[in-house]
């Protein structure tokens, strides 16, 4: 369309059609076309989506209806060797491979009113202790272990998978066909904390054996925070107290 030999000369630039303004126009045309295209496809799929929304099931129970009540069991630092997995909780008696339990968050069970426990989630938060270490956390877990099975403290990595986004992993402990009978756990939790898990949780939920490692080639120090999250449906939900000049 134009003389190619004049392409790089200064004074012949005015006759060239493709300048910056022209590029801008092309770009905005493209954007316009894309926007209209998106609107058309949205209008096309909207009734289908409305229909699908009626049958939608939340995949992750953590996101579902209900309230999440967390009890942090412990927070500690462990050294993990390469190509091995370390057991986090062996649930034998009161000790989780440790002498004392640290109960963070609250001294008593935070659930007071009549509440139905829909689900129990085992949550794991992992953090590297040294800065600038580039490795990913791996884990393996078993749910249906025999109650008398004595788990090994350290195992070789079998087929691990990478710990989920944000270095947080949640394991759903619900057993199929088991409903949880108690509606008020606070008294039970307070009077015998030592037997709380054995007597009141493990008959109705899976008891997880969780192993954690990483794909680094050196010994790494890992900060492990373990908590149990109760998924709760409230019969008497919390109502905000009215405060103001009229009350």
Curated annotation (Swiss-Prot):
InterPro entries listed in its UniProt record: Polyhedrin
Coiled-coil residues: none
Cellular component terms (Gene Ontology): viral occlusion body
Transmembrane portions of the chain: none
Keyword Lyase: no
Keyword match Iron-sulfur: no
Gene Ontology terms for molecular function: structural molecule activity
Pfam families according to UniProt: Polyhedrin
Keywords from the named record: Viral occlusion body
Stated role: Component of the virus occlusion bodies, which are large proteinaceous structures, that protect the virus from the outside environment for extended periods until they are ingested by insect larvae.
Similarity section: Belongs to the polyhedrin family.
Name the UniProt record assigns to this protein: Granulin
Organism: Agrotis segetum granulosis virus
């Amino acid at each position: 369309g134009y003389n190619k030999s004049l392409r790089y000369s200064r004074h012949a630039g005015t006759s060239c059609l493709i300048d910056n303004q022209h590029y801008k126009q092309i770009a905005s045309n493209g954007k316009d076309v894309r926007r209209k295209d998106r609107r058309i496809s949205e209008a096309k799929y909207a009734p289908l989506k409305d229909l699908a929304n009626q049958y939608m099931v939340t995949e992750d129970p953590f996101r579902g209806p209900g309230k999440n009540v967390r009890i942090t069991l412990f927070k500690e630092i462990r050294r993990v060797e390469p190509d091995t997995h370390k057991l986090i909780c062996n649930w034998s008696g009161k000790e989780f491979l440790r002498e004392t339990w640290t109960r963070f968050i609250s001294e008593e069970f935070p659930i007071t009113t009549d509440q139905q426990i829909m689900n129990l989630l085992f949550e794991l938060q992992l953090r590297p202790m040294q800065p600038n270490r580039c490795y990913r956390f791996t884990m393996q877990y078993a749910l249906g272990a025999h109650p008398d099975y004595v788990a090994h403290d350290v195992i070789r990595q079998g087929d691990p998978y990478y710990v989920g986004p944000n270095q947080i992993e949640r394991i759903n402990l619900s057993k199929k066909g088991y409903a949880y009978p108690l509606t008020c756990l606070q008294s039970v939790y307070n009077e015998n904390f030592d037997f709380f898990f054995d007597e009141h949780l493990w008959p109705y939920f899976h008891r997880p054996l969780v192993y954690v490692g990483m794909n680094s080639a050196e010994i790494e120090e890992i900060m492990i925070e373990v908590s149990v999250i109760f998924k709760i449906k409230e019969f008497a939900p919390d109502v905000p107290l009215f405060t103001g000049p009229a009350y």
